[in-house]
Amino acid sequence: MKAIVLAGDKQYLTPILTTIKSILYYNQQVKIYILHQNIPSDWFHEVKIQVERLGSLVEDIFIGDVIDLEWKTQGHISPIAYARYLIPRLITEDRVVYLDSDIIVHGDLSPLFELDLGDYSLAAVRDADGN
């Protein structure tokens, strides 16, 4: 299965669900890890049922208070955005793709999993606004 990681909080449930739906529209056999501090377990239960019907999985990765909610961020960005830095410690997959939780996927993500990284352990792209 392709491993995809998202991070979010309970105020971001609609964008997370939208991102999941767009991933699954174009991709099958996906394992989606969601890093969080406060997403209710009943939400995960419902999402897992829906995603499993499509042949994919959702994993609830509670990170506790590892990230201080008072950490400095810019504007609308939540401190949970720092969770991406925990991926190597929390996810044991050979390769993962981290996606922001407020995006729409418009195609097959397989090329990202097949990309030759050479000796690098990480690849990244700039945001559309150039940051």
Question: PLM features: residue spans?
Answer:
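Glycosyltransferase catalytic domains, chiefly GT-A lineage
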Residues: 1-131
